[in-house]
């Protein structure tokens, strides 16, 4: 258990290092308004904090920097969400000022604004298509055995999927198929489309369309691939280049290479709990992120969690500001999407 004096010194060291990216010495601490005790006391307390593993030496300076353990203690016990400026709030609210008609635009704007306001990299995991309801479907033939299915959802999302038929399909049959699907499936959740087609719509297809079973199975396979698609939206992918920790080209190249691997990034969201979660340094799953922190917030439609927003920055990131921004963006995004889905 740290004493109040040690807590204060640790907090000031973390805050000063976040601001300056320079190791913090006892002389710097003695000039801080909040610290009123002697230089000797400061040095003794810093020595104790170092022995306990909360701060550590650097090779190039006599000052100290927070260790991962120090950051973790700071985040768990000393951190409070930063109060945002009026300008910050206006920028966030401007994303959602007008009624949102397309989910992708709201999510992509959220990612971009977060990266702009933090100067870090932001990632938004969009809701799966399965969360949407069908508004309209079109099937456009492009070759005798190939067509493109265009699904339009209630959130404005447009999904294009190629359908490969094992045999040539009559154009009039495709037209009948589209009419029946739109008549019977409008408003049905995307996740239920395949089931509804095979259990209910098949009766109508059977009586109106030749080779209906061939068409049906090809369409079913296409819908399966649509439902399972996770979508990632990025902002500020190369913002890490602005951070002094990433002036090492090899280090930043490995991180940027990881960010380009969509399946690897999706793993970062696999066990996301509701609310705000913070992973620091080696707590992250990847070696490329051992000098990074990842702060994640969830967003909802009504009470249902449907996606996540994350900010990746150096372990020296401004935790207070990022948490404050994530809380506001996730809250506003949740309200906008709830309105969009309910509408």
Swiss-Prot record:
Task: Provide this UniProt record's keywords sorted from A to Z.
Answer: Repressor, Stress response, Transcription, Transcription regulation
A Gene Ontology biological process in which this protein takes part is: negative regulation of DNA-templated transcription
The family database entries (Pfam families) matched by this protein are listed as: HrcA
Q: GO molecular function: any one? A: DNA binding
Keyword match Repressor:
yes
Could you tell me what this protein does?
Negative regulator of class I heat shock genes (grpE-dnaK-dnaJ and groELS operons). Prevents heat-shock induction of these operons.
State the similarity comment: Belongs to the HrcA family.
Alphabetized NCBIfam families for the sequence:
hrcA
Q: What is this protein called?
A: Heat-inducible transcription repressor HrcA
